[in-house]
Amino acid sequence: DYEIHREDVKALRCKDEVDLLLKFLDLWRRVDPDILTGWNTTFFDTPYLVNRITQLLGEKMAKELSPWKLIFKEEKEVQGRTQVSAKIVGVSSLDYLDLYKKFTYTQQESYRLDHIGYVELGEKKIDYSEYGTLQTLYVENHQKFIEYNIKDVELVVNIDAKMKLIDMALALAYDAKVNYEDVYTQVRMWDVLIHNYLWKEGIAVSPKRFKGKDSQYVGAYVKEPQVGKHDWVMSFDLNSLYPHLIMQYNISPETFIDDTPYSLSIDDLINAKPVEIPQDKVLAANGQCFRRDIHGFLPQMMQRMYDDRVIAKKAMLEAEGKLQEETDPQRKKQLENEISKYKNLQLAKKVQLNSAYGALGNEYFRFFDIRQATAITMGGQLSIRWIERKVNEYLNRILNTQEIDYVIASDTDSLYITFDRLVQSVFKKGVSPGSNDSQRVINFLDRVAKEKLEPFIDKSYQELADYMNAYDQKMQMKREVIADRGIWTAKKRYILNVHDSEGVRYKEPKLKMMGIEAVKSSTPEICRTAIKDALKIVMMGKEHELQEFVLDFRKTFTSASFEQVAFPRGVSSIHKYRDSASLYRKSTPIHVRGSLVYNNEITRRKLTQKYEEINEGEKIKFCYLKMPNPVKENVLSVPNYLPPELGISDYIDYDKQFDKAFLEPMKVILDTIEWEAERTASLESFFG
C-alpha cells in the first residue's frame, strides 16, 4: 500500500500489472500527448513501457499508444552497447537528457538525473543505497519506492521550470517549420530553413547530391600564449563571428565563383600584401572569390536572423525593465509570459545562427562545399590575426616601444591583451592588483576600451574590408572582461581574476577559467571546489597563505569518502580489455581495469542481486588503493557508491589521490609564477 502525504498526489489502486497497464492506456488516450519527455526516456522508459504492454496485453494494445497505431523499434550502438528505442508514431519524443546535452554546452562529470538535479537545483534523488537495487526497494519498502519515482518526475519538471529547454526546442521547431525531434540535427533544420526561404523567393532547391568530404579543411586559429602571470588584462570578442563572416564575404552557393583561387598565403593577407581585385568580386581568405553584384541568400538569412534576435532581445529587456516597476499581479503575469516568449525566441535565433556553420561544414548538407567552408574558417583566422597585428602596432606606437607583443593570447574570436605597461605609465606611483587603487584602474581601462581601443578596432576592420573588397564590413569586436590578473599555462588554459564583464561591475572579483582542472568534469568535485578557492589565493594572496590552505585541505581530503575523492570518468571498451585468464589485458586503461575488478568482485561475492555491474558507456568513479588489500588490485571503480561488503574503505590511497587530483593540476599553474603548493624543508631550516 501507499500512504498519501501530499495534496498534489493521487493514488489509483490496481489489482495487478495488467490492470495497471489498462488504466494507464486509458489515461494516455484521454491526455492524448503530443510530446513525451523524461530522463533517458528514449532508451529506457519508452521501450520498457512498449515491451511490458506487448508482453502482457499484446502488440495490438501496445500500438494504442500511437494515434496512427504504429510503433517502430530501432537498435542503435551507443558507446559500445546496443540500445533499443521505440518510436511511437504521432507522439514526439524530446528526451530531456538529450535536450540537456545538446543545449547546455557544458561537460558534466555524470549525466545521471541525481547529479544534474544537484548541479542545477541543489536537489538529489531519494537515496535507497541501504537496499542496493530498485527491485529490493520495491519489495521491502514500497512506500519509499513510490516516493522515489515521484521525486524523479519532480526533478525533471523543476529542471525544465528553470531551464525551459522544451520551450526552446518548440520555438526552434516552429520557427524552422520542422518536427520537434529535428531540432537536434543542424543539417536537417538548416535544409528546411533554406528550402522555405528560397521557396518564398520563387526559387526551387536543387536535389541533394552527396559527394563526400575528400579532405579536411582548416579550423580556427589559436595563438601560442605567453605562458605565465600577466597584470591588467582586457579581452575583446568578435560578435557572432562565423555568421558575420558569411555576411561580410557574401558566402553563398549562388555567389561562389568556381575559378582558380588567388595564390595568397594567410600571412600575405595579414600583412596586407598588395592585390588587385575586380570591383565585382569579393576576395575570401582562402583565395576564392564570391560575386559582389548580387546578395547571396545565405548572408540575407543570417542578417534577418541576427536582426530578429536583436529585436527579440530588446523586447525581452524592455519587458524585464517594466516587470521591476509593475505592481499589478495580472500585468506582472503577462510581462513574465512576454519575457519567457522573447527569451526563447532570441535563444532560438542564437542557436540557429551558431549552428549554421556546423551545417555548412557537414559533408551531408545539401549545400556543402569544402571551398566555401574553408573560406569561412580562414576568414576567421584572418580577422583575429589582422587585429592582433593592428593592436600591437597601435600599443607600441602609443607606449613608445618597439615590437613588444601585448597580445597574450588569441582564440578563434577573442584577444587577450595586457595593459600593465599603460597602467604603470599613467599611475606614476605604481599600482598592483588587489590594491586600494584597483577600482580607479578598472574605471580607467573601461574608458580606454570604449574611447580608444574599440574605435581603433572598428577603423582597422574597415581597412580589412576595403582590402578584401568585402560585400560589407561586419566585424564587430567589443570589450568583454577587465581583469587585474591573469595566468596562462598553455593554449586554451587560463585563469582571469575578473572585475568587470561586459559592463557588469562585480563587488568581488570572479574567476574566469578555461581548461583548468577546477572546471573539468573529470576532477573530483571536492578538488574542483578546492582548486577554485586556492586560485583565489593565487590571484589575491601570498604564497604562505596558499600553503596553509593546502595543508588544511589535505586534512579534509584524507577524511573524505571514496565517492568524494574518486575520479569521475566515462567507461567504454570493457569487453575489449576483458581477459578470461587474467581478468584484464595489458595496457588496459586504469578506470577500465577498476571497472573489471569491481564486476569481478561483486560476482565473486555473489552480490549481483544487490548491486548492478558496470556496463559499457556508463559514468563511473575510480580510486587508487594501497596494497595489499581485499580486492588484490591497486584500483577500483564503482558505478554510484562503494559497496561496504568489499571492505576497502581503509585502503584508499589518499596520498596518491591527493597528488593526482589536486597537487598536480595546481603545480602546472604554480610553476608559471614560481610558487610551491607545500612548504619544502631547506638546509637552513633543518639546522635552525
Give the ranges of each region predicted by the language model.
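Active-site-proximal helix-loop-helix substrate-binding element of RNase H-like nuclease domains
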Residues: 4-11, 46, 55, 59-153
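Common nucleic-acid-contacting/processivity interface regions adjacent to the catalytic cores
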Residues: 132-253, 259, 330-393, 409, ...
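Mobile, glycine- and charge-enriched loop segments
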Residues: 1-24
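Short beta-strand
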Residues: 406-411, 469-470
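C-terminal, non-catalytic extensions of nucleic-acid polymerases
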Residues: 446, 450-688
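Proline-aspartate-enriched helix->loop->beta-strand connector
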Residues: 24-49
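Catalytic palm subdomain of template-directed nucleic-acid polymerases
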Residues: 415-451
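Active-site cores of enzymes that catalyze phosphoryl transfer or operate on phosphate-rich substrates
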Residues: 1, 27, 282-365
